[in-house]
Amino acid sequence: MGIDLIAGGKSKKTKRTAPKSDDVYLKLLVKLYRFLVRRSNSNFNAVILKRLFMSKVNKAPLSLSRLVEFMTGKDDKIAVLVGTITDDLRVHEIPAMKVTALRFTERARARIEKAGGECLTFDQLALRAPLGQNTVLLRGPKNSREAVKHFGPAPGVPHSNTKPYVRHKGRKFEKARGKRKSRGFKV
């Protein structure tokens, strides 16, 4: 048994050409950035459009602490994130920043505005920086999700830091390795 090839060889890799979501506001942004990509020769707009198509997992949130870290010494620039900006209580003082994002959590928005900064939407950004001038394009940490901690070499093999799926955090479950016969080995 072979594989059925479409005329012209193997099937190409798939990539999104539109967002999966039915969010009408997202669709309006896609419409706007499609226009900008078509009419301007700007790579920035093409990247924004591609990221608007992405799934939620690939639009990782960014905390205020990381945002502050990335924006030090770039006071005149606008931070751009296709995703959510979340608050971080570990940061006590934040500088005045201009930030564009799809979403801001309530506290993050309040803190940015209180510090004298601005929270912009992507349609406002398109008016201010149609070609992405003076912007810093950022991404959140994709691999910080809880689920990702379980990926990798099997837990229990040497040098593996993979988190096991444990049904219970009790005394005799995965905590007892090396302490009882039934849990691997006993020393």
From Swiss-Prot:
Gene3D superfamilies: 3.100.10.10. InterPro entries: Ribosomal_eL18, Ribosomal_uL15/eL18, Ribosomal_uL15/eL18_sf. Keywords: Ribonucleoprotein, Ribosomal protein. SUPFAM superfamilies: Ribosomal proteins L15p and L18e. One of its GO terms (cellular component) is vacuole. One of its GO terms (biological process) is translation. Residues 165-187 have a biased composition (Basic residues). It comes from the Eukaryota. Residues 150-187 are annotated as: Disordered. GO terms for molecular function: mRNA binding; structural constituent of ribosome. The keyword Ribosomal protein applies. Belongs to the eukaryotic ribosomal protein eL18 family. This is Large ribosomal subunit protein eL18x. The gene is RPL18C.
